[in-house]
Amino acid sequence: MNSYSDAATQPEAPAVWLLPPALYVLRPEATALLDQVNERVWATVDPALLETIRLRIAWLLGNTAGMQARNALARVPEQKVAELPRYATSPLFSALDRDGIAFAEQFVIDVSGTSQESLDALRGHLGADRLRDFATSVYLVEFTQRLQQVAAVLLPSMPDRSDAGRSEQRPASLGELLGSYQDAVVRSTALDPVTTELVRLRCARTHNCRICQTLRLADADAAGVDGEMTSKIDFYETSDLAEPHKIALRITDAFILRPDALSDDVVGPARATFSPEQLAELCLDITKWSTQKIHVALGTDGTDGLPVNEDGVVLFGFQPDGSVAGYWADPEHPVVVRTRTKR
């Protein structure tokens, strides 16, 4: 993909991806990697196109701070910003702008509704080899904003860090950097496996990711997560799931549906139930699991070739370094997986 690094990595560039200070304190490794991914995405995709998409997503999410922020080096004229509500007909927007923004809107609102026509249009503009990076960029500007909104309300106030939002770049592709971020998220084990799995499956069902709905975390399976428990996720409020699990699912829903509507009725019990470290892990977990939206949008979320067992489940686990240990059908399959705390 063409590089826009000269425009996107200058020291004076405003870090529109800057996270709430508490996240940098509670999860320094993962947030440093997320900063790297965000820096790289602005150097990979045309920053002017990405800025218009970021602003449109900010409006969709009710993110007032995001709508007011600007990445100055994207150089999007304010006249064009003012025309964003009319992007489909305004002469200020190119065909690529229109198709890119329309794709982003569908990605945010209901990613499973992404049409082949939309993908074909973008493929025509960008080329097949650049489509995944574009979808990844939309995911990043969406979920960075969701993370900013939710963490700012959910986590305690902490002093700003002067170095936040800037990080030393590593020589890696956008996909490789995103993978490193996901591995770092997985390495945290403050949450118990049952909570983690219920949250993961809530994300999968909301985004309608076929492969993620089929998967089952091995440590959660060993901790008692079965078909009966997972059947309660869709109607968790009226179920007999434990209250901590319901609280975690309420946070998940706010995060992936209406981050601007996270209420005191959710925040208060969350802070009383979970430690700041656990809440930070929960927020980052949701961003990690939601990378599934990239696969759903591109139609690469199929289960072909996976070892599905008689319960329709594929077990999987992680190595201590956060990488996937493998996929298997047998619960007794020997594999090294990370250890987790239990509530």
Predicted region positions:
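Hydrophobic alpha-helical segments
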Residues: 1-343
